[in-house]
Design a protein with these regions (language model features):
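Surface-exposed receptor/substrate recognition regions of extracellular proteins
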Residues: 1-362, 366-368, 372-474, 480-505, ...
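Short, glycine-/Ser/Thr-/acidic-enriched flexible segments
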Residues: 11, 32, 91, 242-244, ...
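Short, charged, low-hydrophobicity "junction" segments
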Residues: 51-59, 119, 394-425, 453-457, ...
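Surface-exposed or flexible loop/turn and strand-edge residues in extracellular/cell-surface modules
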Residues: 81, 130-132, 141, 146-148, ...
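Extended interaction regions within the primary functional domain
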Residues: 87-90, 137, 405-406, 452, ...
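Intrinsic low-complexity repeat tracts in disordered regions, enriched in small/polar residues
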Residues: 130-150, 168, 189-191, 196, ...
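Extracellular beta-rich repeat passengers
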Residues: 176, 366, 370-380, 512-517, ...
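Right-handed parallel beta-helix
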Residues: 425, 430, 439-466, 510-635
């Protein structure tokens, strides 16, 4: 009985048996050795022999012989019974197979056919009218095929399908031919392959009547002129060339189109040859590249800071504008993408490229130089105000469906029956013409002026007309609410911007501009639903010339614009230039953008819904009409944020870098971070929320604090002109600021000055214009809340005083400054300051020098109107856990409540302002003469601890309370 235990056994007998068998398999002479079940196993010698046999059989298969004699001479390497091939001596075959039979190569009868043989057989088939193509079932029936110049389906009675047709492999058979056709077959790009018209004309077959001829392959062409000069019968030709190569096919339906060099070629017979492609590139349209040596020279010159040499190197390079425009024209025609992912090109921006399809230019470079664009300010036409102003030069203009503009008759009807719905707070416009355009946008522009910029009534371009816009809902609903009270019956222009069928994506090249004072737009967005990605921009402009109206990305009267990833730089001295400029647009998203040194974001005359994430800008500007603006993780370096508009403004995690902008000169406005745009009446009637702010200073700055007493996070009124701009100045009704840190690591030794304040909210004037003269109100905030404010890296002998609210000495002049009537306590505004922690290393502060609440002035100036008006702005100020609380309120009526923290001063100059203090420490801080200030007659103290005054001073007065 065979020794055959179960697999997996670990008995000593099994292990010994395995060892003996392995020794025989590896070292024994036998060809095979039985396993423990009795079945033979190949030994190592047997396996090596088999491998050699296989190798010998493979050798002849890898060899090719020119003649039979050459193969016979190598018979030693062709094993007995193996086959090999030698080249046929004539055109009857490509190669002939032979076998080694007893040392002699003998023909097997098998041959590899040549192309000539295949062509001969095909010719015989054609001449006999047989099927060059057929579908054959297993039973031998051929129900479908092509013969005698026609498609046939003899065995089919009917082919049924739904209205959608049949789809297979990504292709579709549709049972509803287009108008004018009995049947037609299209290429994927829309060109007709073949078909039959209703009048019986055959297209694309041998006897076609439209001049198209048959679909015959042609030879290759060396260049486009070879196709232009071609007179043969072929309708398919291949251009062979570096970067320009591709297949061209005659379009028999097109007899009128002009050439698009590289896309549509017209031959001497008048046929139109269309490029067949899944996408096109600028190279295909013969866009001249910047030669490699020139590009290297330009890059080296720029690396050395030699801009003029770089311009000189590019002066001999041919511009690529026309080729770029042609590439997009052809892509638009066939609805295919444009891709150019390498190469460098020079553009003069003489005409714009119209973009209607997905575009990918990442990896390529577009230069502009001393002759690109124009050397003049061009903001473009203004509807109704300056309609004939020259258009700006544009490099790319992204377009979509045509807008629907209301006719004069439709405007008259709208003004009579529907314009009354365009009032602030409305989300309803029952205008029937809007109903079919659900999801689009309605835009209305009034003939009436809302604002005169800077009070200028002479220049039409300084007039801001009433306007409003919103996306269209169902049956009269509006997505965005109306924000303006447009005068009824005043609409002078209105349009519907339709919703697109898809989002268009534009991936940017690296834009490099060299010329000074050259104005143009890189990308104009003239259609909604656009994604602009991966912008890289470098400017070598100098500081000596203006760049006003220079814009990289512009969008106007559209919606759903997404700007994703950007790196843009320019010179710091340039004003009026922006990396992104948005006008009259809904729903804009800007993410991961870096726009410094003169570049920033501008919401100019109209934006609803701006969402920004992780951006770094030189400045953020809203000239007029910014509504619902939300920034997260925003860095502003060098300048500031200017606001105008309303609804809600929200900024989370804001970093401010205060630095020089031009040599050693730092502009005046750099002593504040967020301001209300003065040239538009400081009008910002919305909620302002700021959460998480860090402010830092450049160590190399000059003594910027010598000419000003504060740095203001939010400045609600500045010190500009007081001209009547046509509207009331409506400051944010609610301001909420949380978690502010002033990092003073960059402040010079011995600074800031002792009379310096770090302010949360500041007004430098009580009125934007004099109400008694202009009749224009200045409405101050109803509610101000500051929660969490301190400084770090303060020098050991310096103070850093946190000021929650700083108001002007002329507050009494604004007798209509409140939106609300006074309450029973005599106040109509609320200011709440929590957790303001000043750093006091030198406990000596002069009177009116630096305080937590700063309302200077003299009660002797108060007028009867100020005291008696129900709408004089009178705040109730609450301080919670502020250390120290320094109260300075001689200039205006106010009520002050202090809870917790540490009280250092209450000064009213005897104006009767009340103050209540609960659960606080009281440690008075004297001035340099040791004088302390505490208005004991109007200050009621409850549950507080009295500490000795700081710096060894004494308090000679009394306390009132318990």
């Amino acid at each position: 009985m065979a020794f055959n235990p179960e697999l997996g056994s670990t008995s000593p007998a099994v292990l010994l048996d395995n060892a003996e068998r392995l020794d025989k398999l590896v070292n024994g002479p036998a060809a095979d050795v039985p396993d423990r079940g009795g079945d033979p196993l190949y030994s190592w010698r047997q396996m090596m022999a088999k491998n050699d046999e296989i190798r010998q059989n493979i050798i002849p298969l890898s060899k090719q012989y020119a003649t039979l004699a050459a193969a016979q001479a190598d018979i030693a390497n062709i094993p007995e019974g193996s086959t090999t091939y030698y080249r046929s001596p004539d055109d009857s075959a490509l190669a002939i197979e032979v076998m080694n039979v007893g040392g002699t190569l003998t023909a097997t009868g098998r041959k590899m056919p040549s192309s000539q043989a295949v062509d001969s057989v095909r010719g015989l088939i054609d001449s006999q009218g047989e099927n060059p193509f057929s579908v054959v079932f297993k039973n031998g029936l051929s129900p479908f095929g092509y013969k005698d110049g026609r498609l046939y389906a003899d065995e089919f009675q009917k082919l049924y399908s739904s209205d959608a047709g049949l789809e297979f492999g990504g292709s579709i058979i549709d049972n509803n031919p287009p108008d004018g056709w009995r049947f037609v077959i299209y290429y994927r790009n829309g060109l007709v392959m073949c078909g039959q018209r209703n009048d019986g004309t055959m297209i694309g077959f041998g006897e076609g009547g439209s001049g198209g001829g048959s679909i015959e392959p042609g030879d290759t062409a060396a260049d486009y002129d070879s196709i232009r000069n071609y007179t043969g019968t072929a309708t398919v030709r291949d251009v062979v060339g570096q970067r320009t190569g591709g297949r061209f096919v005659v379009n028999p339906d097109d007899t009128t189109s002009g050439e698009i060099p590289g896309g549509i070629l017209v031959d001497v017979l008048g046929r139109r040859w269309y490029r067949q492609a899944e996408f096109v590139s600028y190279d295909m349209f013969m866009a001249p590249r910047v030669p490699g040596a020139t590009l290297l020279a330009v890059q080296v010159a720029l690396a050395m800071g030699n801009r003029s040499s770089a311009i000189a190197y590019l002066s001999g390079v041919e511009a690529a504008d026309a080729a770029i425009q042609n590439a997009h024209r052809y892509a638009n025609l066939l609805n295919i993408p444009v891709r150019q992912n390498d190469g460098a090109f020079l553009v003069l921006v003489d005409h714009e490229a119209e973009v209607r399809t997905k575009t990918s230019l990442g990896g390529s470079i577009i230069f502009t130089s001393a002759d690109s664009g124009v050397n003049e300010i061009r903001w473009g036409p203004l509807r109704l105000l300056d309609p004939t102003a020259p258009e700006p030069k544009r490099m790319f203009n992204i377009k979509g469906k045509e807008r629907i503009e209301l006719t004069p008759a439709e405007l008259a009807t709208f003004n009579t029956s529907y314009s009354q719905y365009l009032k602030k707070g409305s989300n309803y416009l029952p205008y029937p013409k809007l109903y079919p355009y659900y999801g689009g946008m309605f835009y209305a522009l009034s003939n009436e002026v809302e604002i005169y910029r800077n009070g200028n009534r002479d220049n039409p371009r300084d007039r801001v007309l009433y306007r409003d816009f919103s996306r269209i809902g169902r049956n009269g609903a509006l997505t965005e609410r109306i924000v303006k009270d447009i005068p009824t019956g005043s609409i002078g222009y209105a349009a519907i911007i339709p919703k697109e069928d898809d989002f268009l994506e534009f991936e940017c090249p690296h834009f490099i501009e060299l010329g000074d004072s050259r104005r143009f737009l890189n990308i104009e967005v003239s259609r909604p639903m656009v994604r602009i990605k991966n912008l890289v921009h470098t400017s070598w402009q100098t500081a000596s010339t203006s760049l006003e109206s220079r814009v990289v990305i512009s969008a106007r009267e559209v919606f759903d614009v997404f700007c994703e990833y950007g790196e843009t730089t320019c010179h710091p001295a340039e004003n009026g230039s922006y990396v992104i400029c948005i006008r009259d647009t809904c729903n804009v998203h800007i993410d991961n953008y870096y726009g410094l040194h003169g570049w920033g974001f501008q919401g100019h005359h109209g934006i609803k819904g701006l969402y920004g994430n992780r951006n770094t800008f030189n400045r953020v500007d809203f000239h007029s009409f910014g509504y619902d603006v939300f920034f997260k993780d925003l860095t502003v370096k060098g300048r500031q944020i200017n606001l105008q508009g309303g609804n809600e403004w929200s900024i989370e995690k804001l970093r401010l870098y205060i630095t020089r902008t031009s040599g050693d000169a730092v502009e005046y406005f750099l002593n504040y971070a967020i301001g209300m745009r003065q040239d538009y009446a400081s009008d910002c009637d919305g909620i302002l929320n700021i959460d998480g702010v860090t402010v830092m200073w450049d160590r190399g700055l000059p003594a910027w604090y010598n000419t000003t007493r504060s740095f203001d996070l939010v400045r609600i009124i500045d010190s500009a002109n007081s001209l009547d701009q046509g509207i009331d100045s409506k400051l944010p009704p609610t301001i909420t600021i949380r978690n502010i840190v002033f990092d003073l690591a960059g402040i010079q030794t011995g600074r800031p000055n002792d009379n310096f304040e770090f302010c949360a909210v500041t007004a430098l004037r009580s009125q934007f214009t004099d109400y008694a003269v202009t009749g224009r109100k200045t409405l101050l905030p109803d509610n101000i809340t500051v929660d969490g404010m301190t400084a770090i890296n303060v020098q050991p002998i310096q103070n850093a005083v946190m000021c929650g609210i700083k108001l002007p000495a002329d507050l009494y002049q604004n007798t209509v400054g409140s939106r609300n009537k006074k309450g029973s306590d005599g106040t109509n505004a609320r200011i709440t300051l929590r957790n303001l922690h000043s750093v006091i290393n030198n406990p000596s502060i002069e009177l009116a020098a630096a305080q937590t609440v700063d309302i200077p002035g003299d009660a002797a100036n108060w007028t009867t109107d100020y005291l008696n008006s129900d709408y004089s702005w009178i705040p109730r100020i609450t301080l919670d856990n502020c250390i120290p609380a320094i109260i300075h309120t001689p200039g205006a009526k106010a009520v002050v409540d202090i809870h917790g923290g540490k009280l250092a001063r209450v000064y009213t100059n005897g104006n009767g302002n009340r103050c209540r203090v609960t659960s606080a420490d009281i440690e008075l801080i004297p001035d340099a003469s040791g004088v302390t200030y505490f208005a004991a007659d109007k200050t009621l103290v409850t549950g507080c601890s009295w500490l000795n005054p700081a710096s060894g001073a004494t308090y000679p007065g009394t306390l009132r309370g318990s």
